[in-house]
Amino acid sequence: MDQCDVLVIGGGPAGSTVSSLLSEKGWKVVLLEKDNYPRFHIGESLLPMSLPILDRLGVRDKVEKIGMIKRGAEFVSQYHNGSSATYYFKGARNKNHPY
């Protein structure tokens, strides 16, 4: 492709998503990524509120098979003897997700 309407740099979750959605709308999109995916990277996880967009893109099953489901968050404090607090998404106010 010699020309494009949109050049997206970075094929992580955000870059891949915006590229797919713009392409659906008819834009000529070029996505550039230097790394191979999937790869381990802090912050890449399957958060419950991302499920609707993954469903819309038709990739939820593939992403779930990678195994990055995030069921909650744990906070550890070096200032409190290494104590931690864990919060699970299933205890959140919004119950429209499976975990």
Give each language-model segment a name.
Residues 15-16:
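N-terminal Rossmann-fold NAD(P) dinucleotide-binding loop
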Residues 39-80:
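N-terminal FAD cofactor-binding segment of flavoenzymes
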Residues 3, 26, 70-72:
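A structure-centric signal for secondary-structure junctions around beta-strands
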Residues 1-12, 30:
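Beta1/beta-strand and adjacent pyrophosphate-binding region of the FAD-binding site
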Residues 1-3, 77-99:
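Conserved N-terminal helical subregion
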